[in-house]
């Protein structure tokens, strides 16, 4: 089987993607998400990813390459973009910093492809993510595996898998700015931030 280095942003997005890709690839999951804030949330999401892989019976099929919390990597890249709206230039740089590291490690370890679970969410622009992946692949001499994992009912399947295995599903995308936005929205609706039963925003 060809080998793919799969950047995983969270357990929910990884669920149906792993179910699909492990049929055709030898998958190594890369946990590199310096955008996540605070560190306790970073740690919680990583534990959820490991738990998911175990509960799906993929522990013998999927390797995990995990990097520690490096929030400064993210903050350096988005300097000057702090006030950008959600889905704006700050988010584009967030995609780029994670895929840049994925491309680097793909080259270093000799994987056949690199890819990301980011395209599963309906809140993410798959065309933009694929464009960044292709650009970084050309620059690094690697191969990007294009995807739009939300197709073929991928996002709904991820919800089913998380409910089946009782996997933590976060309420905000991940960075400090999206967390603040979620709190503001929740307060305006009289809600208290907590775990999601309906998927990440």
Regions found by a protein language model. Name each.
Residues 1-19, 24-201:
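Nucleotide-activated chemistry modules centered on ATP-dependent adenylation/adenylyltransferase
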């Amino acid at each position: 089987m060809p080998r793919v280095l799969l950047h995983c942003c969270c357990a929910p997005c990884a669920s149906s993607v792993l179910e699909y890709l492990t049929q055709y690839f030898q998958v190594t999951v890369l946990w590199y998400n310096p955008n996540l804030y605070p560190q306790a949330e970073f740690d919680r999401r990583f534990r959820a990813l490991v738990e998911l892989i175990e509960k799906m019976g993929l522990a013998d099929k999927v390797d995990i390459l995990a990097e520690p919390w490096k929030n400064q990597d993210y903050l350096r890249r988005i300097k000057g973009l702090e006030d950008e709206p959600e889905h704006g230039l700050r988010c584009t740089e967030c995609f780029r910093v994670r895929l840049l590291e994925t491309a680097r490690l793909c080259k270093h370890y000799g994987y056949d492809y690199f890819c990301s679970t980011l395209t599963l969410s309906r809140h993410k622009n798959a065309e933009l993510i694929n464009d960044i992946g292709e650009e970084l692949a050309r620059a690094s001499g690697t191969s990007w595996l294009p995807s739009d994992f939300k197709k073929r009912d991928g996002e709904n399947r991820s919800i089913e898998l998380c409910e089946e295995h009782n996997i933590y599903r976060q309420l905000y995308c991940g960075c400090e700015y999206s967390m603040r936005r979620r709190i503001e929205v929740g307060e305006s609706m009289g809600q208290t931030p907590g775990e999601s039963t309906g998927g990440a925003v």
